[in-house]
Amino acid sequence: MRYFTNVHDLGDLKTALAEAFEIKKDRYKYENLGKHKTCLLIFFNNSLRTRLSTQKAARNLGMDVIVLDVNQGAWKLETERGVIMDGDKSEHLLEAIPVMASYCDIIGVRSFAHFENREDDYTEKILNQFIKYSGKPVFSMEAATGHPLQAFADLITIEEYKKKERPKVVLTWAPHPRALPQAVPNSFADWMNEADVDFVITHPEGYELDPKFVRGAKVEYNQMKAFEGADFIYAKNWACPGVTRPEDYGKVLSKDMSWTVDAAHMAVTDNAFFMHCLPVRRNMIVTDDVIEAPTSLVIPEAANREISATVLLKRLLQGLEA
């Protein structure tokens, strides 16, 4: 394994889940695998769970870790070819990438959507430059259109807590004051479509996710109807993906608070567990009583980020030896 950007890079999910539960029993089982190997984590955007869990995962495997915050202390980077660099950007990404790669064995990149150009975002311009020019294994720590480490942790959590063989899992849009990328819902849909679950997506009209992520999932515009009999509710906001109206890409089309996940919504489920990737806007995405209920999984879900990252880095390290 050399790259990790989506569910297909991981291969068979049952095998990956078995590895995850093996590692959860003994986080240090492979502590010598990363000896004398360095993991470089490059952050173009803020992070809490990804930053901490990925560093912890790398150290579980015996790796050294370097963390670079591109916008704090490093030179400002130009990402476009052909640009006359007479502004405030001192270094081009095309030189910076091979330089950074020379100091490490594996690279993680976190770079959000800019909402300036849908094509640039959905072709993963920044992440793919690292894949193309670094010559090293590269993994996504959340890119413009996907967050596979989060989705893998979500799947681990569902597998741990499910009460039936094939649970009903609902991804629901919820309101937020800002325009947020589609990375988390895209990846969640990507992974749930490969898992053994009854998967439903619900959102207001105009918020249709890209078909390559939705695939065969049922889409329901009536949120209450979607929630009926659900075993897991996964709440997340996302800005308009621009699928039906490209000119609306990245816009906030609605802040309809009736989509906030509250006790009335949860009452029509089958005593469903509540999930969210965090950070969460309380009483916009979800009410206090729901996120604080015993059925809220946001903390164990976040803890599983260490496990998903450990499995991923283990696979990449084993790929170096192949």
Predicted regions and their residues:
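Short, structured coil segments at secondary-structure junctions
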Residues: 61, 133-134, 195, 215, ...
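Phosphate-coordination loops involved in phosphoryl transfer and adenosine-cofactor binding
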Residues: 33-39, 166-168, 271
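C-terminal helix-to-coil terminal segments
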Residues: 292-322
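Phosphate/diphosphate ligand-binding glycine-rich loop within oxidoreductases
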Residues: 34-41, 47-159, 281
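Positively charged, low-complexity intrinsically disordered leader regions
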Residues: 1-52, 56
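Rossmann-like adenosine-cofactor binding region
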Residues: 212-289, 295-296
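Glycine-rich phosphate/diphosphate-binding loop of Rossmann-like nucleotide-binding domains
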Residues: 44-62, 66-67, 159-236, 241-242
